[in-house]
């Protein structure tokens, strides 16, 4: 899996430039020639759209303008990648809704698997034209990590515009030292990351480390390297990393548990009491209505929700899971015994609010 940010593809005068993309394409070709399968997650559609209608970003609502620019630039982005390869390049646009919904998640995995079987090169981007919440900091970094797990990738390579992770921002701190090997993403390591590193893209080093943590939970190592350096990219094509290696977690979690842990969450939560919290965290139990204190938001049956301990600072999030009942239903059955569900609601989807197979403790 290779993630390429828009700062490596955007031309100084607007639009897209093959300057750094060519070297990255050669890295891809070297891996393909070695018999490896590869998927690209590429930003750059908005930057390409700005060259087509430069004034679009100055007119109308900011989100709507970015969505329009993404629609304008997506074809140019795919054309940029296609020019480097003889094999067909397949455009795949995803949103967090696709990754949140289990059925669509599995369909996306099946489609990507078939594209790879057919010898195509999938190029994935966020479907910014229909996304709203997703147009946020570092979205494609996190998207790359989730897709890496989705396709069972062996490694996640993130091309950036600096030489990897440093102990501090090397552009402002001359004492910053490079970190070649990161065995574990500790709070101290995360604190070394600053904010957004580019005027073009939306992701900084912090989001790249968050992506590495998500990939690591699936047993996937992450490699950060400078995509602007031809020497670095050529060395990488020969399996020599000049950047930062971030090790995967020692304990790999099951694919479904990974999806439960990292799939985007609906704007909702189930509030539970101390007894339910102890049962979830200590016994691996399902969540029953008797331990439920209430619900936040307006989620539906089958939505991914957070499970929070009530009466704590910020309602501490203990777990995530797929709710068997809507927020409205949960408010009505909260604190009741499971056998009362049908009498209260007039129907029942089972005794559990969240079954343990659909739940992961954080």
Curated annotation (Swiss-Prot):
Enzyme kind, highest EC tier: transferase
UniProt subcellular location: Cytoplasm
Pathway terms, separated by semicolons: Amino-acid biosynthesis; L-proline biosynthesis; L-glutamate 5-semialdehyde from L-glutamate: step 1/2
InterPro entries linked to this entry: AceGlu_kinase-like_sf, Asp/Glu/Uridylate_kinase, G5K_ProB, Glu/AcGlu_kinase, Glu_5kinase, Glu_5kinase/COase_Synthase, Glutamate_5-kinase_CS, PUA
Any one Pfam family match given in the protein's UniProt record, by short name: PUA
Keywords: Amino-acid biosynthesis, ATP-binding, Cytoplasm, Kinase, Nucleotide-binding, Proline biosynthesis, Transferase
A cellular component term, taken from the record's GO annotations: cytosol
Reactions it catalyzes: L-glutamate + ATP = L-glutamyl 5-phosphate + ADP
Binding residues for ATP: 3, 160-161, 202-208
Gene3D superfamilies: Acetylglutamate kinase-like (3.40.1160.10), PUA domain (2.30.130.10)
One GO-annotated biological process of the protein: L-proline biosynthetic process
EC numbers: 2.7.2.11
Domain PUA: residue ranges: 267-348
UniProt-listed PANTHER family: GLUTAMATE 5-KINASE, ISOPENTENYL PHOSPHATE KINASE
Annotated family: Belongs to the glutamate 5-kinase family.
Free-text function comment from the UniProt entry: Catalyzes the transfer of a phosphate group to glutamate to form L-glutamate 5-phosphate.
Name this protein carries in UniProt: Glutamate 5-kinase
Species annotation: Xanthomonas euvesicatoria pv. vesicatoria (strain 85-10)
Upper classification of the organism: Bacteria, Pseudomonadati, Pseudomonadota, Gammaproteobacteria, Lysobacterales
Gene field: proB
């Amino acid at each position: 899996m290779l993630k390429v940010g828009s700062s490596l593809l955007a031309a100084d005068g607007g639009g897209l430039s093959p300057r750094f993309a060519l070297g990255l394409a050669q890295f891809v070709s070297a891996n393909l020639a070695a018999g490896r399968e590869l998927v690209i997650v590429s930003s750059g559609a908005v930057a390409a759209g700005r060259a087509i209608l430069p004034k679009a970003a100055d007119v109308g609502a900011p989100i709507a303008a970015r969505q329009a620019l993404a629609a304008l630039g997506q074809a140019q982005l795919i054309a940029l990648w296609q020019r480097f390869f003889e094999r067909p390049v397949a455009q795949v646009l995803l949103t967090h809704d696709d990754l949140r919904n289990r059925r669509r998640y599995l369909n996306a995995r099946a489609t990507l698997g078939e594209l790879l079987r057919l010898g195509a090169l999938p190029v994935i981007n966020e479907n910014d034209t229909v996304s709203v919440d997703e147009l946020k900091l570092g979205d494609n970094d996190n998207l790359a990590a989730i897709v890496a797990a989705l396709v069972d990738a062996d490694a996640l390579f993130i091309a950036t515009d600096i030489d990897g992770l440093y102990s501090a921002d090397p552009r402002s701190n001359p004492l910053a030292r490079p970190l070649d090997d990161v065995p574990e993403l500790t709070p101290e390591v995360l604190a070394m990351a600053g904010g957004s590193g580019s005027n073009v893209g939306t992701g900084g080093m912090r989001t790249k480390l968050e992506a590495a943590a998500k990939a690591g939970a699936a047993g996937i190592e992450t490699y950060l390297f400078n995509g602007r350096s031809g020497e670095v990219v050529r060395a990488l094509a020969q399996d020599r990393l000049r950047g930062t290696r971030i090790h995967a977690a020692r304990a790999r979690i099951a694919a479904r548990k990974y999806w439960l842990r990292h799939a985007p969450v609906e704007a909702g939560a189930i509030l539970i009491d101390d007894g339910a919290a102890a049962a979830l965290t200590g016994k691996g139990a399902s969540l029953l209505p008797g331990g439920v204190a209430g619900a936040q938001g307006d989620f539906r049956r089958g939505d991914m929700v957070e499970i929070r301990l009530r009466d704590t600072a910020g309602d501490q999030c203990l777990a995530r899971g797929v709710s068997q009942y809507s927020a409205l239903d949960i408010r009505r059955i909260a604190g009741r015994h499971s056998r009362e569900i049908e009498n209260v609601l007039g129907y029942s989807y089972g005794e559990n609010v969240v079954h343990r197979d659909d739940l992961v403790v954080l």
